[in-house]
Amino acid sequence: MGLLTILKKMKQKERELRLLMLGLDNAGKTTILKKFNGEDVDTISPTLGFNIKTLEHRGFKLNIWDVGGQKSLRSYWRNYFESTDGLIWVVDSADRQRMQDCQRELQSLLVEERLAGATLLIFANKQDLPGALSCNAIQEALELDSIRSHHWRIQGCSAVTGEDLLPGIDWLLDDISSRVFTAD
């Protein structure tokens, strides 16, 4: 029995996953996390540092790291990459002016060695706002079709209403499970 097999078996028992949620400031990362956890989302302030929540969902223990997206904090993102099973990239669909910045930051994450193999879920958040870009427009702006290094999916959602958060999370868990909890 090889080390990888032993590690997979240990991880299978725990069914514990580490999810890293990143994105530009004001994209809605903390709101998504709180909504998913059933918390009030009326009064949320910018994350200066990070939040960690441990949630149970579909028999998984999810350790979700929500890291602030202000420009001054982005250089610290790399401190959170270790052992990440899934990366959730949150996009403010109504913030057309920063799509290029958003694309640049995402592309720089995807070449990080410690994120290699992590499943990527892109939440196109704020779909409930007038003028929000469609998932197709965001897919094009972020050049998602060029991603070959990670399994990825874009999911439109609204953190405030909670609409379409679960389908995205469920896809992420299914994709990670197919890689991490494989039968030998």
Swiss-Prot record:
The modification Phosphoserine is found at S45. GO terms for biological process: bicellular tight junction assembly; centrosome cycle; maintenance of protein location in nucleus; negative regulation of GTPase activity; positive regulation of cell-substrate adhesion; positive regulation of microtubule polymerization; regulation of aerobic respiration; regulation of glycolytic process. Pfam families: Arf (PF00025). The keyword Glycoprotein does not apply. A lipid is attached at G2 (N-myristoyl glycine). It is found in: Mitochondrion intermembrane space; Cytoplasm, Cytoskeleton, Microtubule organizing center, Centrosome; Nucleus; Cytoplasm. Keywords: Cell cycle, Cytoplasm, Cytoskeleton, GTP-binding, Isopeptide bond, Lipoprotein, Mitochondrion, Myristate, Nucleotide-binding, Nucleus, Phosphoprotein, Ubl conjugation. Transmembrane segments: none annotated. Found in a complex with ARL2, ARL2BP and SLC25A6. Found in a complex with at least ARL2, PPP2CB, PPP2R1A, PPP2R2A, PPP2R5E and TBCD. Interacts with ELMOD2. The GTP-bound form interacts with ARL2BP. Interacts with TBCD; the GDP-bound form interacts preferentially with TBCD. Interacts with UNC119. Found in a complex with ARL2, ARL2BP and SLC25A4. The GTP-bound form interacts with PDE6D. NCBIfam families: small_GTP (TIGR00231). This is ADP-ribosylation factor-like protein 2.
